[in-house]
Amino acid sequence: MAAYEKAHIDEVASNQWPHWIPVRHHFGIETFGINLWRGRDDGTVIPEHDHGEDGEPELYYTVDGHATFTIEGEEVDAPAGTCIWVSEAGATRAATAREPGTLVLSVGAGPPGTGYAPAGWDSHYLEGDK
């Protein structure tokens, strides 16, 4: 077995959810959360959500294109190359694409002082891909 695995994002993309690229699930990563998100036709990149229940902070990185994040009602401009760290797990956040081809990487961590625990929501959404 090789010491690494590799995959192109088009190989990782969900058939049922083409805007979501389930990187963590694809590689079986259990120590942190990681996904890629493509802008949808309606401009949505990442739907509004928070992590108040699981306490997990998140880092977002705009890989390509241009996104606008809305965090606790405040709009944050995020052109390609921008990192946004949402340290307050309960803060609502969402991202929209300002241009076609926008791609955002999200990385989730466990609450401070704990390890990461996969929430399982990604497996639920992937059931239709089998």
Q: Model regions: which residues?
A:
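Structural motif
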Residues: H66-T68, T92, G101
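Short, conserved beta-strand element in jelly-roll/cupin
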Residues: G52-F69
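A short, N-terminal "cap"/entry segment at the start of jelly-roll beta-barrel domains
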Residues: M1-E48, H124-K130
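Histidine-centered active-site/metal-ligand motif
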Residues: H49-E53, T92-R93
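Short acidic-glycine-tyrosine-enriched beta hairpin
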Residues: E72-G90
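Short, surface-exposed beta-edge/turn micro-motifs
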Residues: T31, E56-L59, G101-T102
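Double-stranded beta-helix
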Residues: M1-A3, H8, T96-K130
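Residue-level recognition of conserved beta-strand positions in structured domain cores
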Residues: L36, V63-D64, I71-G73, E88, ...
